[in-house]
């Protein structure tokens, strides 16, 4: 795997996707960000099994491939990168992150241990709906105050989503 992109694009996507990664996962693979490069597209996936966040963005793909890296360490490296172009290269059991001024080598996790069900979920099924982030945020602000922050009554700790008349 080898690809080029700008630090601005990948920083934003990594910071978004890493929010879904659990700090104390049940399996080591769930502490990672799954990176898949295919035909000038990068797909980042992060999950704690309850929540899956994926980000897709265009890259200059040199060699397609996939890998799994520790989310916390990878996010920290992304924050430290100077602006400009960045090149990611798969070198054995490491991934090399290289800019004009810096170079990092991060140990990879075994991407084959990442739960395949998280990677194969369909985005546009008959049961899925798309809505604007602002609409979702406004709706959650209105009803989120009714959800209990404590686990004493587990049925009251979430927000119920329902789709009526395609709205």
Q: Which residues are covered by each model-predicted region?
A:
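Structural preference for solvent-exposed beta-strand-turn elements
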Residues: 1-167
């Amino acid at each position: 795997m080898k690809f080029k992109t700008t630090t601005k694009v990948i920083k934003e996507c990594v910071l978004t996707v890493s929010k879904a990664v659990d700090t104390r996962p049940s399996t080591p693979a769930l502490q990672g960000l799954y990176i898949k490069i295919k035909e000038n597209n990068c797909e980042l996936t992060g999950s704690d099994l309850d929540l899956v966040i994926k980000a897709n963005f265009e890259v200059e793909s040199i060699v397609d491939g996939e890998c799994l890296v520790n989310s916390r360490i990878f996010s920290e490296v992304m924050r430290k990168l100077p602006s400009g172009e960045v090149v990611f290269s798969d070198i054995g059991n490491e991934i090399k992150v290289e800019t004009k001024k810096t170079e990092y080598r991060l140990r990879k996790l075994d991407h084959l241990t990442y739960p395949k069900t998280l990677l194969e979920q369909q985005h546009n099924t008959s049961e899925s709906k798309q809505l604007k982030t602002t609409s979702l945020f406004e709706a959650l602000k209105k009803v989120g105050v009714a959800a209990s922050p404590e686990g004493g009554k587990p049925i009251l700790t979430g927000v119920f989503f329902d789709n009526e008349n395609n709205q």
